[in-house]
């Protein structure tokens, strides 16, 4: 019997980061928008299994839980994608204001740009917890520009870094200039994902270009989410820049080896072993 080419998994950038953080031993609360449908039930069940707290999420009875469809090529890379994320428009500044006490009590808050520009700006202006941001895509990265100075950590890819810094990256020198520009905007740390060329990690004391770790490539979708989760967990552990970047690369390598967006083998132990 031929295996089905279609695989349906629980996903979403923010949820994937939350899932990986839970596997890495962090206590996680996920604030998202859910419909009254099978997609929401699957997310609820997945989060319950992982101990992820959904109690502050918004339920939209007539809304459809967000969906994301992608087609992978023979190398496991995304060839085509489409999505329906209209439900996230319900995560308004007014709604987020009701969650501000919870957000400000967190050790860190991770946001992605599936939120509206207005909601992202609200978080930047009112959330006092360290903010980590994933630009998600070049099309959505611009939403972060007004709050760059209020972010602690940013994880863009090369194209997103170019857009947010205004620096065209053509070589190592221009890559470093892009990082400097982003740090000058107020960031504490930036991790610029370079695909097959690894990552440039930078803070106000140093910059380091690290190469990818060996991995058996099965599926690259979810690697960036795993990287962000590991970097966030490293922050919680008080890790320095290089250690955080190495953990991110290790988590990304582990994620790459699973057909699912999340590798169930993800753990702090697995990350540490991959680095050695």
Each language-model region and where it sits:
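Short, glycine-/polar-rich solvent-exposed loops and beta-turns at beta-strand/coil boundaries
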Residues: 61-63
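Aromatic/hydrophobic pocket-lining residues that form π-stacking "cages" and hydrophobic walls in ligand
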Residues: 17, 43, 120-123, 251
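Glycine-rich phosphate/adenosyl-contacting loop at the front of the ribokinase-like
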Residues: 1-33, 38-49, 211, 216-217
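Conserved phosphate-binding/catalytic region of the ribokinase-like
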Residues: 140-141, 145, 172-276
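Acidic active-site catalytic centers that drive phospho-/nucleotidyl reactions
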Residues: 16, 134, 160, 219, ...
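Short, conserved phosphate/pyrophosphate- and ester-handling motifs at nucleotide-, phospho-/glycolipid
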Residues: 21, 157, 224
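Short alpha-helix plus adjacent loop in nuclease-associated cores
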Residues: 65-68
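Ribokinase/PfkB-type carbohydrate-kinase core domain
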Residues: 45-59, 70-206, 267-270
């Amino acid at each position: 019997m031929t295996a089905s080419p279609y695989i349906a998994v629980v996903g979403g950038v923010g949820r994937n980061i939350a899932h990986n953080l839970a596997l890495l031993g962090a206590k996680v609360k996920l604030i998202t928008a859910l419909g009254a449908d099978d997609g929401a039930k699957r997310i609820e069940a997945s989060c319950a299994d992982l101990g992820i707290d959904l109690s502050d999420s918004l339920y939209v009875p007539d809304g459809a839980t967000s969906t994301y469809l992608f087609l992978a090529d023979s190398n496991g890379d995304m060839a085509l994608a489409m999505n329906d994320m209209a439900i996230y428009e319900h995560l308004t500044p007014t709604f987020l204001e009701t969650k501000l006490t919870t957000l400000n009590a967190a050790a860190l808050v991770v946001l992605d740009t599936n939120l509206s520009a207005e909601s992202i700006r609200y978080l930047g202006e009112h959330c006092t917890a360290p903010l980590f941001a994933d630009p998600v895509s070049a099309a959505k990265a611009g939403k972060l520009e007004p709050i760059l100075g209020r972010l602690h950590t940013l994880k863009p890819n090369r194209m997103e870094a170019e857009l947010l810094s205004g620096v065209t990256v053509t070589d190592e020198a221009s890559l470093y200039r892009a990082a400097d520009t982003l740090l000058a905007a107020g960031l504490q740390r930036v991790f610029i994902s370079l695909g097959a060329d690894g990552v440039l990690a930078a803070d106000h004391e140093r910059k380091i270009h690290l190469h990818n770790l060996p991995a058996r490539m099965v599926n690259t979708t979810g690697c960036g989410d795993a990287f962000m989760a590991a970097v966030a967990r490293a922050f919680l552990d008080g890790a320095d820049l290089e250690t955080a970047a190495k953990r991110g690369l290790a988590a990304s390598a582990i994620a790459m080896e699973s057909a699912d967006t999340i590798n169930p083998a993800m753990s702090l132990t697995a990350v540490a072993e991959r680095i050695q």
